[in-house]
């Protein structure tokens, strides 16, 4: 029989070994998360305010020697004199707390979050990536089936080459602590990032460092590429600047974050020939109105006038209108000056519509001549698996050292004729998105996200529908009141609205109901089927 003292010694030894190999936390700067309120809304039109907070990603943090001030990572290079392997760097290096405004240019006020592009303190910081927290050590997760996600945005100060991106990824809610016990930092310090590019520029993945095989970037003084990448599904709700915008679905083979190795990761960080070698779809099925020929829909002075703030609504429609149904459509609406604006439709007969559906994605890939990796990795069904499983909200501002953001706001690829379908994505010249140029010439750029709302369909916004006659317009009014529940203060908004039918034989409000080549429903559950052009009619 083993005596209790022997058991104690063994447990103590194992505990010491685990700690010695763990991803560490610094003690010099207290981690205080900036507060950010957001709302959950129901079909009755009532919205409850939640007092949340945001945390900056671990990749932006000071990484230093445990118990000292020597940098483990400086510029875009690891200090191999401190550690030289993924496991030893995890035990010898610590992630430090953040000073959000002075170091990273991140400020919050109520429901508003502002991200500055370039912030100069002791070092120059470029951009940022933050996550919404449920509590100090857990990311907020959203299950988006049969729901909508809404926010206000100001992109008027984002020129060519910048991307104010708000999106969802399938990160672990605790930042990876449960699955990878060597990760002692967790969500509190912004660990566990992943996306559909399987990024290899992360300093830590799965509780270990990424020093092995690390190659400093030749163009980015702050970044490099390691042997490992971090993969997971990604739903880009919003990627935009003052010129162009897009929303994109990126499915993966697994709904859970996974680590990959080398060029088998695929995506942006692998050789061009290996772009599609990974377990995720790096291209996705995207909708950029400009790319689909609708060049007057989004931009300064256009239908959605981005010289001033506006509201973005994204709806996730299931086949039977239930939370457990199959994802069939990802729909976009805008609200500006009290008017609800349906997404600008494609002008191409071969790929008609204004939302992401399985048939639209297939038609898009065929029309543009793109490799249909979306279908290879499960298409809208696989994207639905991730959305139903729960995803973490990311709010970011970044520039692009790999492709100069041309894929968003210019002609891309640059070797193709700009008049070919799908090549022109915006009006930016192909010479303007260079990251070094943007950082030097537009350091004062910023994006503001505010009034985040999540709820049942048609519960998070109000306004008068655009287009069509007055008989097809539905006026939505709001009336605010306050109430206190438990220890939280909640704001309840009452709203009269028209609720979409869940029938599969009719088009939903703001959905497509006709046009050349259209084979879907032609009757509206709400509103009137209104012709926008020969290829697109919409329920308004």
From Swiss-Prot:
Pfam families according to UniProt: CBM_1, Glyco_hydro_7
Residues the record marks as carrying a glycan: 434, 458
Gene3D superfamilies reported for this sequence: Glycoside hydrolase, family 7, domain
Alphabetized GO MF terms: cellulose 1,4-beta-cellobiosidase activity; cellulose binding
Keyword vocabulary terms for this entry: Carbohydrate metabolism, Cellulose degradation, Disulfide bond, Glycoprotein, Glycosidase, Hydrolase, Polysaccharide degradation, Signal
Catalytic reactions on record: Hydrolysis of (1->4)-beta-D-glucosidic linkages in cellulose and cellotetraose, releasing cellobiose from the non-reducing ends of the chains
Name the record gives this protein: 1,4-beta-D-glucan cellobiohydrolase B
Organism for this UniProt entry: Aspergillus aculeatus
């Amino acid at each position: 029989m083993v005596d209790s003292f022997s058991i104690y010694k063994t447990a103590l030894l194992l505990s010491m070994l685990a700690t010695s190999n763990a991803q560490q936390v610094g003690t010099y700067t207290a981690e205080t998360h900036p507060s950010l309120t957001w709302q959950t809304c129901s079909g009755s039109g009532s919205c409850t305010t939640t007092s949340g907070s945001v945390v900056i990603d671990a990749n932006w943090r000071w990484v230093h020697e445990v118990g000292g001030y020597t940098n483990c990572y400086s510029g875009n290079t690891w200090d191999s004199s401190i550690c030289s392997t993924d496991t030893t760097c995890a035990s010898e290096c610590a992630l430090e707390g953040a000073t959000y405004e002075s170091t990273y240019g991140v400020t919050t006020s109520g429901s508003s979050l502002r991200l500055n592009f370039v912030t100069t303190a002791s070092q120059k910081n470029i951009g940022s990536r933050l996550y919404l927290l449920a509590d100090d050590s857990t990311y907020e997760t959203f299950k988006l089936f049969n729901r909508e996600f809404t926010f206000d945005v100001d992109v008027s100060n984002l020129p060519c080459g910048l991307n104010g991106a708000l999106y969802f990824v399938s990160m672990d809610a605790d930042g990876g602590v449960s699955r990878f016990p060597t990760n002692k930092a967790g969500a509190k310090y912004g660990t566990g990032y992943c996306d559909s590019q399987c990024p290899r520029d992360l300093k830590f993945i799965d509780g270990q460092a990424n020093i092995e095989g690390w190659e400093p970037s030749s163009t980015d003084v702050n970044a490099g590429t390691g042997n490992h990448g971090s993969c997971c599904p990604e739903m880009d709700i919003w990627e935009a600047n003052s010129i162009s915008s897009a929303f994109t679905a990126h499915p993966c083979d697994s709904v859970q974050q996974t680590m990959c190795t080398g060029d088998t990761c695929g995506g942006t960080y692998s050789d061009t020939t290996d772009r599609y070698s990974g377990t995720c779809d790096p291209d996705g099925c995207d909708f950029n109105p400009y790319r689909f020929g609708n060049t007057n829909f989004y931009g300064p002075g256009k239908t959605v006038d981005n010289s001033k703030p506006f509201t973005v609504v994204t709806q996730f429609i299931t086949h039977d209108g239930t939370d457990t149904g199959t994802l069939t459509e990802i729909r976009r609406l805008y609200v500006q000056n009290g008017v609800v604006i349906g997404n600008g439709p494609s002008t191409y007969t071969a790929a008609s519509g204004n939302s992401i559906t399985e048939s639209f994605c297939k038609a898009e890939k065929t029309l543009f001549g793109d490799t249909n990796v979306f279908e290879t990795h499960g298409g809208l069904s696989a994207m639905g698996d991730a959305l139903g499983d729960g995803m973490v909200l990311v709010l970011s501002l970044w520039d692009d050292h790999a492709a100069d953001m041309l894929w968003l706001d210019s002609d891309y690829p640059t070797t193709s004729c700009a008049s070919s379908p799908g090549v022109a994505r915006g009006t930016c010249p192909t010479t303007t998105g260079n990251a070094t140029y943007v950082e030097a010439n537009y350091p004062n750029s910023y994006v503001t996200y505010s009034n985040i709302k999540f709820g049942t369909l048609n519960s998070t916004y109000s306004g008068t529908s655009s287009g069509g006659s007055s008989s097809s317009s539905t006026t939505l009014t709001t009336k605010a009141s306050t109430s206190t529940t438990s220890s939280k203060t909640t704001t309840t908004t009452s709203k009269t609205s028209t609720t979409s039918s869940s029938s599969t034989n009719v088009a939903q409000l703001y959905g497509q109901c006709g046009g050349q080549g259209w084979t879907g429903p032609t009757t509206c559950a709400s509103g009137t089927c209104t012709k926008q052009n020969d290829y697109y009619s919409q329920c308004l």
